[in-house]
Amino acid sequence: LTLVVVTIVCLDLGYTLTCLICPEEYCKRIHTCRDGENVCFKGFYEGKQLGKQFRRGCAATCPEGKPNEIVQCCSTDECNH
């Protein structure tokens, strides 16, 4: 019985990544990613007219940045703060 419990705990069945998802600089909104989305990302751009702009979310792979945007990716829960 102990071996069965240890096996289930180690397999971590049904794990789903959670990422922050909001356009603000300081984000607290947590989103559960869909199956296949194994990366959290944060994009940052500072424009002359609109000031600082952020985008955060889940992705299957690290997205490419838009022109003049810096994108950072990670793969642990809520790592895209």
From Swiss-Prot:
Tissue expression summary: Expressed by the venom gland.
Transmembrane stretches, start-end: none
InterPro entries, per database record: Snake_3FTx, Snake_toxin-like_sf, Snake_toxin_con_site, Toxin_cobra-type
Xref: Gene3D superfamilies: CD59
A Pfam family matched in the record: Toxin_cobra-type
GO cellular component terms listed in the entry, alphabetical order: extracellular region
Primary location class: secreted
Signal peptide per UniProt: 1-16
One example GO MF annotation: ion channel regulator activity
Subcellular location: Secreted
The protein, known as: Weak neurotoxin OH-72
